[in-house]
Amino acid sequence: MTITVSITRRATFAAAHILCRPEWDEERNDQVFGRCARDHGHNYVIEVTVSGEVNSETGMVANLKDIDGVIRRELIEALDHRHLNRDVEFLRGVIPTAENVAAAAWRRLEPHLPARLVRVRLIESENNSAEVVA
């Protein structure tokens, strides 16, 4: 019987953003996005979960060091202490909601991870998170 095991790695980054549509006036942006229609920041937590069979030689699904390297290279270096609307090329033209950032993170990570990506969870605050699942 084959058993599939999932492992999750967490990383953190701090970033600023604004939720707005430039073609809308301030009143409409405030109605839709509330206080988030003004520049503000978050201390984000991202959880990356991969899945696979446990390697009989190493006892691991994937080496966490390798997963850390991918997360750092593909996400943290691009996002940490940046303004998501202005500074991050892969978010250009996208409203950087938690949902959109989580989806973009999935697209960045998936081709580089050493095991099958099954979940990306972006925690924006203690009350807000977005999750992309396979």
Regions found by a protein language model. Give the residues of each.
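Charge-rich, low-complexity N-terminal segments
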Residues: 1-134
